[in-house]
Amino acid sequence: MKLQVLDTKGNEIKEIALNDYVWGIEPHQQAIYDTVISQQAALRQGTKKVKTRAEVSGGGRKPWKQKGTGRARQGSIRAPQWKGGGVTFGPTPDINYKKSVNKKVRALAFRSVLSLKVKENNLVIVDKFDFAKPSTKEMVVVMKNLKIDDQKTLIVTKEKEELVVKSSNNITGVKTISANQLNVFDLLNATKLLITEEAAIAVEEVYA
């Protein structure tokens, strides 16, 4: 397929030929779902911890005799029904939340989301950013020129470009990453994908 490449003023300056295998497939919803779940699960740190009845402080003896008091029988003040007692089936840090997805499914999900951006006209390719210094004002102007200033946008450059990152940091709803950091969740979380020509080629080389 061929798509237009714009300059930062919003002018069409040339066409770029992109591989249909990466940018033009029918989106596979299950692959997308599985990959997002896997990515989110990997972020869970598993740092929550509560004490069981074996770990809380308190005596192990019976608080009162079994019969004759008129009260319900109790075995220990560390039992879960007591205030300050242990927690039953509480969270522990040894739980492995990881959900594995094989490379083929992950790649299919990636191509599916990229194709979805093209299909929904939410992909904008720019030739390059040419900031002389960090400038939020200039980035806002660029986004207005590209008609994406009111959209949640993911900006992707081939390498990390500090001037682009610093220029977009203070703009609500805008995130900037390099091509090797691109992931399915960030793509789905943004309405518009603003990618440089170099970054688009780099992404295609990985997934073609």
Swiss-Prot record:
Residues covered by region (Disordered): 50-83
InterPro entries according to UniProt: Ribosomal_uL4 (IPR002136), Ribosomal_uL4-like (IPR013005), Ribosomal_uL4_dom_sf (IPR023574)
Q: Which GO terms describe its molecular function?
A: rRNA binding; structural constituent of ribosome
Q: Which family does it belong to?
A: Belongs to the universal ribosomal protein uL4 family.
| Cited PANTHER family | 50S RIBOSOMAL PROTEIN L4, LARGE RIBOSOMAL SUBUNIT PROTEIN UL4M
**HAMAP family linked to this entry:** Ribosomal_uL4_B (MF_01328_B)
Tell me, what does this protein do in biology? One of the primary rRNA binding proteins, this protein initially binds near the 5'-end of the 23S rRNA. It is important during the early stages of 50S assembly. It makes multiple contacts with different domains of the 23S rRNA in the assembled 50S subunit and ribosome. Forms part of the polypeptide exit tunnel.
What is this protein called in UniProt? Large ribosomal subunit protein uL4
Gene name, please?
Answer: rplD
